[in-house]
């Protein structure tokens, strides 16, 4: 039985709660989402990865979010070549690659990752990452050294397309921009036995408003405010529900290596997990994203420079270990 349990945890099948694959659209679901949009809880998607039918964006009423005088329609917030900038006074001037991209082949970086680089669970938070690290990841996406263990997941495939379409100036200017300002606290980590029921829409978990369910050995990360998230408000973050006891378990693994199961993360990721040179920070970042990266590295689908070091650090980890590590790192202050 122990062997069976270990084999299950070491399975090559990616955990579906972390690799959020959009289900096939249905007319009934589209109609329900359109009604929700009209009610002001826009849970639809945009013209990028995981796009929804255009009908859901047809509401012409101006929308706004707290702390801004900007008003935009839902359709405007879903323009992959002109992402909404609700708080233009809170970031430096954007380079073209972040603000607009290049039609038709290169989406604006600020569309998926938000103009302030805070990102979403289905992609990376770019704010505060080392410029050299961002540049290397784009090279890895372009060369095929960085892929996803779940080939059906939209955002990694979009990154491969965008990396191939981007030129050196696009990449270096975006990297310099996102690395020039800090990442802010974005994820509230909560240990829980039960969580709101969710479904996958637009490559992320969204609540169904239909009661609760056991969390089990998963991380469920969802918007704090669905409407603001779908309007791409870079001031509205996420809540991540993690198993009870996972933060303490993760702390032990992160700080000690768990008696040889892994290595102390601070060795490479720096004191307080805030990064070290070109090595990225982990503190406060999306736990869903962190699990995906550990799993991808363990499976060998992410294999750029320095990946061999990380492969050695994750090759003995079970998915439960990854959950614990990600719960702990996400709970730390950025």
Where is each model-derived feature located?
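Intrinsically disordered, low-complexity segments enriched in Gly and acidic/Ser/Thr residues
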Residues: 257, 264, 272-278, 286-291, ...
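Cys/His-rich metal-chelating microdomains
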Residues: 115, 271
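Flexible coil segments in periplasmic/lumen-exposed cytochrome c-class electron-transfer proteins
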Residues: 10-107, 146-264, 299-334
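Short cysteine/histidine-rich zinc-coordinating motifs and their immediately flanking basic loops
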Residues: 120-126, 277-283
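Sec/Tat signal peptide C-region and signal peptidase I cleavage site
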Residues: 4-9
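Short, cysteine/histidine-rich loop/knuckle motifs that typically chelate Zn2+
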Residues: 111, 267
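Short microdomains enriched in Cys/His and/or Lys/Arg
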Residues: 130-142, 286-298
